[in-house]
Swiss-Prot record:
It comes from Pseudomonas paraeruginosa (strain DSM 24068 / PA7) (Pseudomonas aeruginosa (strain PA7)). Residues 84-107 are annotated as: Disordered. It comes from the Bacteria. HAMAP family: UPF0229 (MF_01232). Belongs to the UPF0229 family. Residues 92-102 have a biased composition (Gly residues). InterPro entries: UPF0229 (IPR006698). This is UPF0229 protein PSPA7_0730.
Length: 423
């Protein structure tokens, strides 16, 4: 059997359609392989795709053929041993049994089909069927809102928006183009007139003729208008629609002393996965990072993931800071507000009821969705049970899950952000 191996790097995307059809056909195999890869690889290791293996039996095409066994009559072409009309004795044992399993120097088989998916395809399967719940349009006034932005230069426009520099530049270029030949002839005539006056001052006929030609050339140049309507350039202003759905995600991470290094690593991996999901699936979304121990602080992305600061545990400090930022920068009638909190569940005992009250009264009525992830192999503590009371009050917009080990990150993430069916 012959095989053709095509090593072209998909020149001009000629095979893209076939590749997409193949990915759709074996979607379940690929999704399973991607889920296994996510649990096996680091969340930060997303700079390459994944090698997918599909069992050979699953890519076989169904074909119609004669079954084994039974009595069949077949006509064969003749050869040097048999001539037309002769009958060949039927072999004994017409059934199709199985071999004894010993090694043989003949026979064929089929290996698993292995291929590589790209980083883009890997992330597509990784975040398939995930979304931010309850994302709705905010600040609806019956019309879209716009902002005016500059969009270059136009040949038409309002006189108040004329661009003087570009207009004069265009006029100067036009004058040079239209009078360039006449100016060259004028320079030559002036040079010749100067020569004749210097060398042949008595040659009045040529001098008079050159003076007449020079006057005609100057008149021709002067007839080129200094400014023409063709030269006018205007600043072009266009209206750009503002997004009607604005969203912000608050990321609250516990970095207190009770969080072991392994627990902090799991929390960081969860937030890296969340951040990757948001930036890939939502073009316009803001992310607010808050780290907390006994006090909370808003930080940038770099400090959120890599700072080594630690301390005691007062979870309510992060919730209070979130509420303050919401009130200051994100009006609830304009923004879809989301939050994701990760902690090991350890908290100062008197602070857990405070967290519950802040959520119930100051945060949950104004957010679209709030997720709490507790990273611990131990039994739940007071904070978990206080949050359960919040979940009872806001069943559709509050979710809590437990992560025991790194292998739980991706399944829990999918559970929290699984696309919901709308009745």
């Amino acid at each position: 059997m012959s095989y053709v191996i095509d090593r072209r790097l998909n020149g001009k995307n000629k095979s893209t359609v076939n590749r997409q059809r193949f990915l759709r056909r074996y979607r379940e195999h690929i999704k399973k392989a991607v889920e296994e890869a996510v649990s096996r690889r680091s969340i930060t290791d997303m700079e390459h795709g994944e090698q997918i293996s599909i069992p050979g039996r699953d890519i076989d095409e169904p074909v119609l053929h004669h079954g084994r066994g039974g009595r069949q009559t077949v006509v064969h072409p003749g050869n040097k041993e048999f001539t037309a009309g002769e009958h060949i004795a039927r072999p004994s044992g017409g059934g199709g049994g199985r071999g004894g399993g010993k090694a043989s120097n003949s026979g064929e088989g089929m290996d698993d089909f292995v291929f590589q998916i790209t980083q883009e395809e890997f992330l597509d399967f990784m975040f398939e069927d995930l979304e931010l719940p309850n994302l709705v349009k905010r600040h609806i006034t019956g019309t879209d809102t716009f902002k005016t932005i500059r969009a270059g230069i136009s040949n038409d426009g309002n006189p108040s928006r004329i661009n003087i520099v570009r207009t004069l530049r265009s006029a100067h270029a036009r004058r040079i183009a239209l009078s360039g030949g006449s100016r060259a002839k004028l320079r030559a005539a002036l040079k010749e007139l100067e020569r004749i006056r210097r060398e042949e001052p008595d040659n009045l006929g040529d001098i008079q003729e050159l003076e007449l030609e020079i006057a005609k050339l100057r008149a021709r140049i002067d007839r080129v208008p200094f400014l023409d309507t063709f030269d006018l350039k205007y600043n072009l202003l266009v209206k750009q629609p503002n997004p009607t759905s604005k969203a912000v995600m608050f990321c609250l991470m516990d970095v207190s002393g009770s969080m072991t290094q392994a627990t902090k690593d799991i929390a960081k991996r969860f937030f890296i996965l969340l951040y990757l999901f948001l930036k890939r699936n939502y073009e316009k979304i803001e992310v607010v990072f808050i780290r907390h121990h006994t006090s909370a602080r808003e930080v940038d992305e770099e400090e959120f993931f890599y700072s080594r600061e630690t301390g005691g545990t007062i979870v309510s400090s992060a919730l209070k800071m979130m509420q303050e930022i919401m009130a200051e920068r994100y009006p609830t009638h304009e923004w879809n507000i989301y939050a994701a909190q990760a902690s090991d569940g350890d908290n100062w005992n008197d602070d857990s009821p405070v967290c519950r009250d802040i959520l119930l009264k100051q945060i949950m009525p104004f957010v679209q969705y709030y997720t709490y992830v507790e990273i611990t192999p131990r039994e739940h503590q007071a904070l978990w049970f206080e949050y359960e009371r919040v979940r009872e009050a806001f069943e559709d917009s509050f979710a809590q899950q437990q992560i025991v080990s790194a292998s739980d990150i991706y399944p829990v993430f999918r559970e929290l952000f699984q696309r919901r069916l709308v009745a």
